[in-house]
């Protein structure tokens, strides 16, 4: 009975839009929803502050974030992994 049960955490995929803060990135998460009345597919977006260790993600990277305990007033997410690095032209 000493087994630890791992909680199922919510995970989202988004693009890093800002990495100017220390140990924090701003992630833009977009989702497509159908309008209830007119049926048109529209894009909804939300920005989340996510905790990142040692500059693991930079602006433009595609990252997966997962929910965690509140780290600060606005941070309750952390970067789980970097899915795709930003391309430099």
UniProtKB/Swiss-Prot annotation:
Q: GO MF terms on file?
A: rRNA binding; structural constituent of ribosome
Q: Which domain of life is it from?
A: Bacteria
Query: What is the documented function of this protein?
Result: One of the primary rRNA binding proteins, it binds specifically to the 5'-end of 16S ribosomal RNA.
Tell me the first and last residues of the signal peptide: none
Q: Which gene encodes it?
A: rpsQ
Q: Which PANTHER family does UniProt cross-reference here?
A: 40S RIBOSOMAL PROTEIN S11 FAMILY MEMBER (PTHR10744), SMALL RIBOSOMAL SUBUNIT PROTEIN US17M (PTHR10744:SF1)
Similarity comment: family membership: Belongs to the universal ribosomal protein uS17 family.
Q: Name one GO cellular component term.
A: cytosolic small ribosomal subunit
Q: Does the keyword Ribosomal protein apply?
A: yes
Please verify whether the record's keywords include rRNA-binding.
yes
Keyword annotations:
Ribonucleoprotein, Ribosomal protein, RNA-binding, rRNA-binding
Give the protein's recorded name. Small ribosomal subunit protein uS17
